[in-house]
Amino acid sequence: MGIKVYKPTTNGRRNMTSLDFAEITTSTPEKSLLVSLKNKAGRNNNGRITVRHQGGGHKRHYRLIDFKRNKDGVEAVVKTIEYDPNRTANIALVHYTDGVKAYIIAPKGLEVGQRIVSGPDADIKIGNALPLANIPVGTVVHNIELKPGKGGELVRAAGASAQVLGQEGKYVLVRLQSGEVRMILGTCRATVGTVGNEQQSLVNIGKAGRSRWKGIRPTVRGSVMNPNDHPHGGGEGKAPVGRKAPSTPWGKPALGLKTRNKKAKSNKLIVRRRNEK
């Protein structure tokens, strides 16, 4: 998918870019796979903001995606490649030979008319899903499960990929996009290939309004607030932070503090951290 560059007809259009959507084959989604999506605007059930900078945006329908890929041995044909407003990756509508329709994450190189299949005996082809233990070393994969049968949780964003490095007993070593090397059960499934729409990260939003269309509200710096609103606020002119280290709006340390639980059970499955050389 290419990048479309706009002429600077207005200040908002200057330097603005967008995807050309050349891979998209239809703009009409499969109605049976849509569910309504309520805009929470970052509020919880008490009406209080629990996630800042969310609200507004264009109304969306949620597309039901098959992350489990557990219809073993049943072939499916790719019918369309579609845009999904709820994720950075594109999605593909597939029709199984038994009549079932499903959406999957569209990997790079997947084309309309291509046949895909899931199961331990599936070929190592783009779009096929099989257990990690059955995938050869060096293969690039995405949509990786962390628990067998739960559905893919890792490597689902546009352009993301992971690589199978080897096998140790019942575990398979996988190098993630961040550089982290992790042990995952060999019975967990993954899909062969890289997630498509890899140029999505190169798009220049161009103007504030495009972020608002996505439901993203402005982020105000703490240093321009009053001291009763933020620890960085107050002072005369452009005042420094005034504390030992930067803080969140609630006084907790920010920028660099590790937030992962040191006693997490999955720590033993991480062979190499993402920031280790």
UniProtKB/Swiss-Prot annotation:
Methyltransferase found in the keyword field: no
Record GO biological process: cytoplasmic translation
SUPFAM superfamilies: Nucleic acid-binding proteins (SSF50249), Translation proteins SH3-like domain (SSF50104)
Keywords: Ribonucleoprotein, Ribosomal protein, RNA-binding, rRNA-binding
Molecular function GO labels: rRNA binding; structural constituent of ribosome; transferase activity
Pfam families to which the protein is assigned, alphabetical: Ribosomal_L2 (PF00181), Ribosomal_L2_C (PF03947)
Superkingdom assignment: Bacteria
Region (Disordered): 219-277
Gene Ontology cellular component annotations, sorted alphabetically: large ribosomal subunit
Biased composition annotated in UniProt, kind: Basic residues: 259-277
Matching PROSITE patterns: RIBOSOMAL_L2
PANTHER family documented for this protein: LARGE RIBOSOMAL SUBUNIT PROTEIN UL2M, RIBOSOMAL PROTEIN L2
Oligomeric form and interacting partners: Part of the 50S ribosomal subunit. Forms a bridge to the 30S subunit in the 70S ribosome.
Family: Belongs to the universal ribosomal protein uL2 family.
NCBIfam families: rplB_bact
Function: One of the primary rRNA binding proteins. Required for association of the 30S and 50S subunits to form the 70S ribosome, for tRNA binding and peptide bond formation. It has been suggested to have peptidyltransferase activity; this is somewhat controversial. Makes several contacts with the 16S rRNA in the 70S ribosome.
Protein name listed in UniProt: Large ribosomal subunit protein uL2
Organism encoding this protein: Streptococcus equi subsp. zooepidemicus (strain MGCS10565)
Upper classification of the organism: Bacteria, Bacillati, Bacillota, Bacilli, Lactobacillales
